[in-house]
């Protein structure tokens, strides 16, 4: 009868507990954890099935809803679980944290105050730095002075590239739990990104002989990876920002934002916080067509166009110089000017002239022998005149203007 009773008791327990809960708790989270999870957590369970609810966790591990929500504040009062995330189901190995009790007794002749402090040792926070955030992984260097909160999609390489002040090897050295191949990097945890002596700004990658960026724009650092090279307007991405909110704040379309910052991905999962994103690009050439030969006097027109295109400018006999902007993406800053006898770049062709970005260029004949210009990015070595493959029209003796 005893054997039979034990059998029935075991069957009753098995019927009461869902088979999905008959598995050991994990001392380390297998999935991402939400921000704010208790730093004293000693066991975790994972929401590995869509049907898994808070009630399942509470009944499986015999914990109260109040305790569960205090250990996992991100679930909220309605206790919503995220599929695949790990949740804390025990703190301090089931022991209470530090408590202090004070008792006071008195008589008619004297007062005696007795203070009794009862303390149960709690495990140290997962951060090995006394003032560091939590949670962190084991083994983090003791002298860490800067931290980064890892989100889904981050890698060791991405983090080191984002900061630009340390190598991936250094990041792994400071955070050894991630492993040599970075497979142990956990979203929802803090990692060390600086120790005493780590630079506070990234090392410049400019060439030793260059004092000016190739496009004339000084780019702030760090930036989103693979950001377009012709960017001249930037915005700093704050933690919690999304692509749509950043684009809206900058007054640009989401499609343009994703095009200028391609590593963000269509779902914006690759957007880096604490880095600059591009919210505006510069044209290949921008210039003002001016009345006098020294770029003074009235402005006849303002022109700009993008790489890979040319532009015909009708001068109406009112242009003697071009004031070319310092910013632009023409290769090496080379601007080609083609002179045409008639408007709309027609009639006789009188050859080429060249200018550079950031230059005031006095035009051939100071504008008297042509009525239009065709402007594009090109170097002198590539033109047909230099290669003897074309012939210019005879230069007129008289002005056409």
UniProtKB/Swiss-Prot annotation:
One matching Pfam family: LysM
What does induction of this protein depend on? Expressed during in vivo infection of insect hosts.
For whether the record's keyword set contains NAD, the answer is no
Q: Does the keyword Signal apply?
A: yes
Task: List, as start-end ranges, the regions of compositional bias called Low complexity.
Answer: 98-136
Q: Which family does it belong to?
A: Belongs to the secreted LysM effector family.
UniProt protein name: Secreted LysM effector Blys8
The organism that produces this protein has a lineage beginning with: Eukaryota, Fungi, Dikarya, Ascomycota, Pezizomycotina
């Amino acid at each position: 009868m005893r054997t039979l009773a034990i059998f029935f008791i075991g069957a009753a327990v098995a019927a009461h507990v869902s088979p999905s809960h008959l598995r050991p708790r994990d001392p380390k989270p297998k999935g991402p954890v939400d921000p704010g999870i208790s730093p004293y957590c000693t066991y975790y369970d994972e929401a590995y099935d869509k049907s898994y609810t808070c009630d399942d966790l509470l009944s499986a591990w015999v914990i109260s809803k109040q305790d569960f929500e205090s250990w996992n504040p991100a679930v909220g009062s309605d206790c919503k679980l995220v599929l695949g995330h790990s949740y804390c189901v025990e703190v301090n190995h089931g022991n209470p944290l530090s408590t202090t009790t004070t008792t006071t007794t008195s008589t008619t002749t004297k007062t005696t105050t007795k203070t009794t402090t009862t303390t149960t040792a709690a495990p140290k926070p997962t951060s090995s730095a006394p003032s560091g955030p939590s949670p962190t992984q084991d083994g983090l260097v003791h002298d860490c002075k800067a931290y980064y909160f890892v989100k889904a999609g981050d890698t060791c390489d991405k983090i080191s590239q984002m900061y630009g002040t340390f190598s991936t090897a250094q990041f792994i050295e400071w955070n050894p739990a991630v492993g040599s191949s970075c497979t142990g990097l956990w979203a929802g945890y803090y990692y060390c990104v600086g120790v005493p002596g780590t630079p506070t700004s990234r090392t410049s990658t400019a060439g030793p002989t260059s004092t000016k960026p190739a496009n004339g724009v000084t780019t702030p650092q760090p930036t989103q990876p693979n950001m377009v090279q012709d960017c001249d307007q930037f915005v700093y991405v704050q933690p919690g920002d999304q692509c749509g909110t950043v684009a809206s704040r900058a007054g640009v379309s989401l499609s343009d934002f994703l095009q200028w910052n391609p590593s963000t991905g269509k779902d914006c999962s690759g957007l880096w916080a604490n880095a600059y994103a591009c919210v505006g690009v510069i044209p290949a050439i921008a210039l003002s067509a001016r009345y006098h030969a020294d770029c003074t006097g009235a402005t006849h027109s303002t022109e700009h166009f993008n790489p890979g295109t040319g532009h015909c400018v009708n001068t109406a006999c009112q242009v003697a110089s071009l004031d070319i902007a310092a910013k632009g993406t023409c290769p090496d800053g080379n601007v080609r000017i083609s002179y045409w006898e008639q408007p709309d770049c027609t009639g006789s062709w009188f050859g080429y002239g060249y200018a550079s970005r950031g230059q005031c260029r006095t035009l051939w004949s100071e504008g008297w022998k042509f009525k239009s210009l065709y402007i594009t990015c090109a170097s002198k070595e590539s033109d047909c005149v230099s290669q003897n493959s074309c012939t210019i029209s005879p230069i007129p003796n008289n002005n056409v203007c």
